[in-house]
Design a protein with these regions (language model features):
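Canonical tetratricopeptide repeat
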Residues: 31, 65-68, 72, 99, ...
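Residue-level detector of conserved catalytic or cofactor/ligand-binding positions
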Residues: 207-218
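Helix-start (N-cap) detector for alpha-helical repeat units in TPR-like alpha-solenoids
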Residues: 26-27, 60-61, 93-95, 128-129, ...
Length: 218
């Protein structure tokens, strides 16, 4: 299996198989698919990844990339099938389970999403710590949507302790506290968010709305 040239594309991570000067046709189609994905041309990306699979059906990375492209279009069931095929071919458990979690999240099947994210976290191994923390954030979001606010806070606090994307994480943590009707903790989190970036419009807007609804807290 080839797992070089990891390409970040928005919220999703696409795996690119190693491409050499004498690369086979599948690799060329895969490369074009990655370029299409990065340009937001997801429909063409799907076509190109399928073409790469036809040319090299045993290359697991192509199935993983296809799953990501399906996810980007909202075709979550097709994405899950592609990620499952990548796993069956011995593909990267981390990227496949991460993608499956995102797909289940899109289907609002949050328990399955959390399970997939957990499997991705366990498979992170020696990958850069930001890869694992990224998935912890997705798991926190899924727990919040499931109504497991305590579990969501546990994940977000782990990210805060790690110093990971603090502005965004404080904002999201404040949102969870609001759902729990803990206005004081929510205000604390939003203030932390603004202390990091005083240009954060969302943070100011949320604080303003809280003060409007809770005038005695001024």
């Amino acid at each position: 299996m080839r797992k070089k040239n990891i390409i970040l594309a928005g919220a999703l991570t696409l795996m690119a198989a190693a491409i050499s000067a004498c690369a086979p046709a599948g690799s060329n189609s895969n490369k074009k698919g990655l370029e299409a994905y990065q340009n937001g041309d997801y429909q063409n990306a799907v076509y190109l990844f399928k073409q790469a699979i036809t040319q090299e059906p045993s290359e697991d990375a192509y199935y993983c990339n296809l799953g990501q492209a399906y996810c980007a279009q909202g075709y979550y069931e097709e994405a899950i099938e592609s990620f499952t095929q990548a796993l069956n071919l011995g593909g990267s458990s981390f990227y496949s389970y991460r993608g499956m979690g995102l797909a289940y999240n899109g289907l609002e099947e949050y328990e399955k999403a959390i399970e997939s994210f957990q499997q991705a976290i366990e498979a992170a191994g020696s990958l850069d710590s930001s890869c694992r923390l990224d998935v912890v954030g997705y798991r926190a979001e899924a727990k919040m949507k499931l109504g497991d606010y305590e579990g969501s806070l546990e994940d977000y606090n782990e990210l805060i302790e790690a110093g990971y994307r603090l502005r965004d994480i404080y904002q999201l943590t404040g949102n969870v506290y609001l759902l729990m009707d803990d206005v004081d903790q929510a205000l604390h989190c939003y203030q932390e968010c603004l202390d990091i970036d005083n240009r954060n419009y969302e943070g100011y807007l949320t604080l303003s709305l809280i003060h409007i609804s809770e005038p005695t807290r001024r």
